[in-house]
Amino acid sequence: MTGRHILLVEDDRFLRRACETSLRQRGFSVAVAVDGEEALDKVRQARPDLILLDLLMPRMTGIEVLRALRAQEPTRGIPVLILSNSSRAQDAEEIRTLGVCDYLVKANLSLQELGDRVTRLLEG
């Protein structure tokens, strides 16, 4: 998995740092974005192998980011793992239709589990 490129989109700086550090220790290359607009800019600069995406962020929600990614052929197939505390049924239904690969609840987040799921998703 060494060198696989992950884009981490998370507005909470403490969680962002913890996830980034944990993933780097596993050998992943990690870019970070603090909101959806920055995430889309980073995707245009360098297509990641996987996106870890928060749903509730300033300026642009995770669902809006997903819609934008899925609307463009070059980004349509990028795997996305959601990190969120949102339990809204409407959000859950929409992210399923947008082809999200996995969903982790932040309140229950284990960095070990995050790393394991990222590894599994990237191994196919």
Regions found by a protein language model. Name each.
Residues 35-38, 61-67:
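Acidic catalytic/metal-coordinating carboxylates
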Residues 54, 84:
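Active-site residues of response regulator receiver
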Residues 57:
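Receiver (REC) domain active-site loop signature in two-component systems and cognate sites
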